[in-house]
Amino acid sequence: MGDMMQNRLYAVAATFSVLPVVFVGLRLWARRVKRVKLGWDDFTIMFALVRSSSYLGSLNRARCLFNATVLRIAVSHKTDTAVGGLGKASKTNADGIPIYDNTYWTHMKVSFGNRLSQVLAIGPTKMSVLFFYRRIFGNSGRTIFDNASMVLMIICAAWTVAYFFGNLFHYMPIKMLWTVTADKLPAPNKQLYLTQCYIDIATDALIISLPIPITFDPDPDFQTYYLATITYWTLIEAGLGIIAACLPLLVPIVRKMSWVLTPRSGQDDIPLNPKNPSPPS
C-alpha cells in the first residue's frame, strides 16, 4: 500500500511540474501572437507559478540544483517522498510509540514550507483572474463591476498577507516544529486553518460568479461577450488554478493552428483585447 501511494505522489509531482509551465508558456505565446502587451494578470500568474513550484519545492533538500526554477516541483516532491517518508505510515517501535528520526524532522520542515508557499501560490492566482476580468470589462462604465472586482482584489491580497504571516508565526519559535516532538507541541489553532479555508472557498465562488451578470447584458459588445464565455474556469488551487487561468488566453494559438487546415473568414479572429483589436497574425 505504501509503495502504491508513493507511486501516485510521483505521478502527481511529474504532472504538475509540467502542465502549469506549459500553459503559462502558451499564455505568453498567445500574447505575442496577438501583439498584446503583458498586463498585471500575466505578471501575477507568473508569480503564482514560481510560488507553486516553491510549494512542492519546499519538499526538496537539493535546493542547490533547482532553487529558482519550476523544475523544483517534481524533484522536490519526489525527494520528500523518498527522504521525508511522504506516503508512508509513520515509524513506531514495538510498543507503538512514534519514532522521531531524520525522516520525521524532514517531513515537519516540508509541512511548514508547504503552508507558506501554498498561500503565495493561490492568492496571486486569484488576483490574476481578477486582473484579467478588469482587462476585458474594465473602463466600460460598469461601476458596480469595477467596484466589486476592486473589493475582491483587496480581499484576496489581504487574505494572502494575513494567512502567510499567520502560518509563519503559528508556532514560536519557528524551529519548534522540527526540534520538539509532536506530543510536546502546543495544540494547533484550528480556527486559523478553518477561516483560511472558508475565505478561500468564498472568494473562489465570488470570482467565478463575478462576470456572470455581464454575460446576460441585453446588449453586450460582441467581442467582450465572446471572451467572457471562455473565462469560466475554476482556477482554484495552485496547479489547476494556473492552468485554468491560462486557458482563456490560448484562443489565438488554437486559431493560428486551425488556419493551416481551414481558410480564414472575415470574422474568425476575435481580439484578446477588445479596446485595442489587432489584425490576424
UniProtKB/Swiss-Prot annotation:
Chief location of this protein within or outside the cell: membrane
A GO cellular component entry from the record: membrane
Record's subcellular location: Membrane
Transmembrane regions listed in the UniProt entry: 9-29, 149-169, 196-216, 234-254
Residues bearing attached sugar chains per UniProt: 67, 147
Topology relative to the membrane: Multi-pass membrane protein
Superkingdom: Eukaryota
Keyword flag Transmembrane: yes
UniProt keywords, alphabetically: Glycoprotein, Membrane, Transmembrane, Transmembrane helix
Biotechnology: Phomoidrides A and B (also known as CP-225,917 and CP-263,114) are potent inhibitors of Ras farnesyltransferase and squalene synthase. CP-225,917 and CP-263,114 inhibit Ras farnesyl transferase from rat brain with IC(50) values of 6 uM and 20 uoM, respectively. CP-225,917 inhibits squalene synthase with an IC(50) value of 43 uM and CP-263,114 with an IC(50) of 160 uM.
Family affiliation: Belongs to the SAT4 family.
Function recorded in the entry: Part of the gene cluster that mediates the biosynthesis of the antihypercholesterolemic agents phomoidrides which are dimeric anhydrides. The function of phiH within the pathway has still to be determined. The pathway begins with the highly reducing polyketide synthase phiA that catalyzes the formation of a C12-fatty acyl-ACP, starting from one acetate and 5 malonate units. The hydrolase phiM is involved in the release of the C12-fatty acyl chain from phiA.
Designated name of the protein: Phomoidride biosynthesis cluster protein H
Upper classification of the organism: Eukaryota, Fungi
